[in-house]
């Protein structure tokens, strides 16, 4: 899950004072001459920044902030949220949560052009905002023309709605199947993993074919990518055999597509046809090899956490999955297809999600809301928080309200829903309560679900405990594990 994903919504009109009124303070590696602020790391990856506080004067809804910049020798960040910074930081007045929206990253060399930060402030008026210009964890030189800095209201992206009246039909074996509960499997699952998850009560495992996750410009060697995929499919053969033995189903998850992501965090194949063609070909390969396994394959999970942050791209997150689904159906007419929504398959993206005009498709959502709670302390992101927190309105009913776009989508299209991921970091106060609230709602709605993740990274592993990543230790039984096992065994279902 990308913790900084921001969901776009409608905008309200407001204005902003002139750039000349902004008082910029210079930090590490920052200098100013006239209207030009320069950040120069002198070849080191220690970054640098300039900061300002601005008053948005009660702006709401969508905003667009712009500034002109020029870069030289800006290094490639090792995380998608590092690199060139044109970023806002403010506290959401409604929830109290901190927000860090930022512009798309640029690297290398580029001449003067406009950086654009587009985000949704929400319906509650926002006042003071911290603005950062700079470089984070990369080397290079960047110049900002602060006389060009501007903030304005912005009508945010509206994705086209298709197949508005379509009702999804399912074969009897899917339509009448009881609710399935399970977990994301480790990267290299063993028979012991499958057996243990089944003993806990798991009925479904999400098999992730993943590498170089969220790494920029990864998976560009197509021959090597296909060779890697073949190895993952060889392991899948074994996983399916173990799943049959222990009475489980497997969701086949292509976790990283060819081409990976660009430096703006958007999937490369949305604008690179060679990557898109290989993506579709990979699903054709999978369908040819595994068709006829409907008894054990829950579904083909087309694309993990699609991320499209521009409205106009040659191949949208939706069309990319449509092309893959159509290619699969020409080969395998029986296996269920699992489709994901934009913005990391988050619940708010279902406001504009459209169904495929295709039967036997299950729609997946990932639940990490509020992300400042679920991902606190992950890569230094977000301060400590607790669950529930009535002062912020964080409780079970808040989760219900955030899932409302998904429940509405399901009703509108008679669609089945699969929660492919949900979790809270091990050291979060009240994580067991958060998990139980989520599971209670998923069971109420009758949605299949997979906890993230079983016997994987220790931050999500329910057998680890500690107050930070450094102090986490495997202790076996934890309150989170008890909640998960109770949920897997349906003890909380009504």
Q: How does the language model describe each region?
A:
Residues 13-15, 20-168:
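Extracellular and organelle-lumenal recognition/adhesion modules and their flexible linkers in secreted
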Residues 159-165, 429-494:
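Aromatic-rich peripheral "rim/lid" segments of glycoside hydrolase catalytic domains that contact
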Residues 5-15:
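Bacterial N-terminal signal peptides
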Residues 154-219, 223-226:
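N-terminal carbohydrate-binding accessory modules
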């Amino acid at each position: 899950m990308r913790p900084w994903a921001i969901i776009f919504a409608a905008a309200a009109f407001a204005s902003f004072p002139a750039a000349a009124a902004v008082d910029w303070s210079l930090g590490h590696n920052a200098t100013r001459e006239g209207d030009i602020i320069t950040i120069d790391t002198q070849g080191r990856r220690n970054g640098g920044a300039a900061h300002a506080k601005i008053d948005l004067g009660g702006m709401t809804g969508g905003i667009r902030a712009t500034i002109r910049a020029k870069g030289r020798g800006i290094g490639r960040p090792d995380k998608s949220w590092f690199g060139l910074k044109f970023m806002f930081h403010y506290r959401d007045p409604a929830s109290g949560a901190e927000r860090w929206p930022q512009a798309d990253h640029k690297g290398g060399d580029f001449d003067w052009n406009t950086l654009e930060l587009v985000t949704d402030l929400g319906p509650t008026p926002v006042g003071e905002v911290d603005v950062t210009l700079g470089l984070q964890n990369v080397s290079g030189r960047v110049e900002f023309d602060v006389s060009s800095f501007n903030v304005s209201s912005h009508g945010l992206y509206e994705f086209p709605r298709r197949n508005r009246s379509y009702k999804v039909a399912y074969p009897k074996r899917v339509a009448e199947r009881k609710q399935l509960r399970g977990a994301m499997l480790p990267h290299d699952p063993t028979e012991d993993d499958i057996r243990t998850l089944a003993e806990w009560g798991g009925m479904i495992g999400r098999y992730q074919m993943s590498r170089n996750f969220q790494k920029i410009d990864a998976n560009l060697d197509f021959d090597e990518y296909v060779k890697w995929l073949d190895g993952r499919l060889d392991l899948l053969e074994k996983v399916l055999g173990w799943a049959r033995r222990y009475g489980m189903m497997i969701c086949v998850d292509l976790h990283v597509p060819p081409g990976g992501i660009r430096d703006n965090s958007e999937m490369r194949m949305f604008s690179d046809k060679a990557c898109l063609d290989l993506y579709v070909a990979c699903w054709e390969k999978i369908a040819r090899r595994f068709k006829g396994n409907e008894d054990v394959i829950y579904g083909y999970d087309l694309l993990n956490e699609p991320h499209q942050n521009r409205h106009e791209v040659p191949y949208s997150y939706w069309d990319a999955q449509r092309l893959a689904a159509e290619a699969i159906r020409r080969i395998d007419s029986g296996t269920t297809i699992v489709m994901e929504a934009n913005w990391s398959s988050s619940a708010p993206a279902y406001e504009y999600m459209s169904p495929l005009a295709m039967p036997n498709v299950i729609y997946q959502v990932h639940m990490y809301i509020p992300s400042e709670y679920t991902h606190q302390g992950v890569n230094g992101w977000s301060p400590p928080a607790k669950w529930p927190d009535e002062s912020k309105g964080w409780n079970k009913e808040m989760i219900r309200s955030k899932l409302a776009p998904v429940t509405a989508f399901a009703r509108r299209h008679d669609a089945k829903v699969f929660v492919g991921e949900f979790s809270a970091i091990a050291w979060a106060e009240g994580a067991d309560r958060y998990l139980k609230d989520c599971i209670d709602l998923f069971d109420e709605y009758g949605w299949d679900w997979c906890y993230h993740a079983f016997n994987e990274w220790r931050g999500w592993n329910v057998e680890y405990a500690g107050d930070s990543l450094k102090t986490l230790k495997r202790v076996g039984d934890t309150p989170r594990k008890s909640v998960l096992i109770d949920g897997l065994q349906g003890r909380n279902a009504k």
